[in-house]
Amino acid sequence: MKDLSVIENEKRNVGLDVVKFIAIFMMIAVHCTDNVSPAERSQPWYNLWGSFYGSFMRPAIPLFVMVTGALLLPVKQSLSDFYAKRLSRLVVPFLVWSVLYNLFPWITGLLGFSPSVINDFFVWAVPDQSFTSALHNILMIPFNFSMYAVQMWYVYLLIGLYLYMPVFSAWIRQASVNEQRFFIVIWFISLFVPYLREFLTKDLWGTCSWNEFGLFYYFSGFNGYLLLGYYIIHNRITVSWKKLFWIGVPLFVVGYCITFFGFKSMTAVPGQSVELVELFFTYCTPNVLMMTLPIFMLFQKIRVNSDIVKHFVVIVSKCTLGIWMSHYLFLGPCYMFIESLSVHTMVKLVICTVLLLSITCTFVYIVRRTGKLGRWIMG
């Protein structure tokens, strides 16, 4: 996610920078809706506009993973060199920010703030200001994120993809285009698994109480997006504007409708389980792929001619990892600010997204400009 490697001709692919810019905007937008409190989520305005806005932004993570595949596959370095370079740039800021987030509640107690201030920043967290709780969460970092660092789920995923890429690259280097297509087709079938397990049978294609790895397990997950990004860029797959309009737009609309109406129907049920609430928002599903692919193809066609715009997009692209790590510090205050505005809910969400992205990007850019230490902190 962080590093923008050169591709073939040793020139920066600004199209991928644009995709990363769109992805980070979408991610910020998703989290602006996530910060709505449990009480507010029961209100009709959230069920409608939160679903409408949040559904539109689901391609964020798949877009990031596709860019990662496009830039880094196949890995050309030795396994040790790749891990030393990539993982260190990822793991160090991940640990720094994970520790800081988990110390935040304890620090608010030291400063004399009420425990309720914690929920101004982390709506879903238990407001515990004890050092014991903070220490427990820090010790659990090697195993999973806490409710004070929810966004770090993606970093665990990214570390896993980085560990996997040198191994995956060995196959990619010798795989023909048809073999790559075969993998993508099988992966596409695996995208239906979440719905089949929910609406058909829990135990599917060999899964049972003693085996969680079913028939398509080895082709499933985000590695499909990883390969898809590589496949499109390195095989120079392009589509005409006409095909984008007649195929891409309907594809996006159908994917969006499935996501929106599915999520809205789930959130309308009182006491619905978290698993069902998130079902239609699951990233590795056909509806999210249907939204992601047209966006990736569209912004690959856009040419940025303005040096000012290009410079701005590249700056944001370089700051994406830092934005991901740090934006939760500013999310609560930004949301509290827009709550006071007398404007439509949809407008509030857009304002919150733009404000949060602007503040966080500026913060990350300034810290990175301080030198090597700043870049280690922000990635």
Task: Name what the model sees in each region.
Residues 54, 58-61, 75-147, 161, ...:
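Transmembrane alpha-helical segments and their boundary/interface "anchor" motifs
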Residues 49-61, 142-157, 198-225, 259-294:
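Interfacial loop-to-helix transition and helix-capping segments at the boundaries
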Residues 9-13, 76-85, 168-180, 232-245, ...:
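Membrane-interface helix-boundary motifs at transmembrane edges
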Residues 237-314:
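Alpha-helical transmembrane segments and terminal signal-anchor/GPI-anchor hydrophobic tails
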Residues 64, 71-74, 103-110, 119-199, ...:
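Hydrophobic alpha-helical segments with transmembrane-like composition
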Residues 54, 249-251, 276-287, 340-361:
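Membrane-interface transmembrane-helix boundary segments in multi-pass integral membrane proteins
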Residues 1-8, 300-317, 328-379:
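C-terminal "closing" transmembrane helix and its immediate cytosolic amphipathic cap
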Residues 10-43, 60-68, 88-109, 160, ...:
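Kinked, hydrophobic transmembrane alpha-helices enriched for aromatic residues
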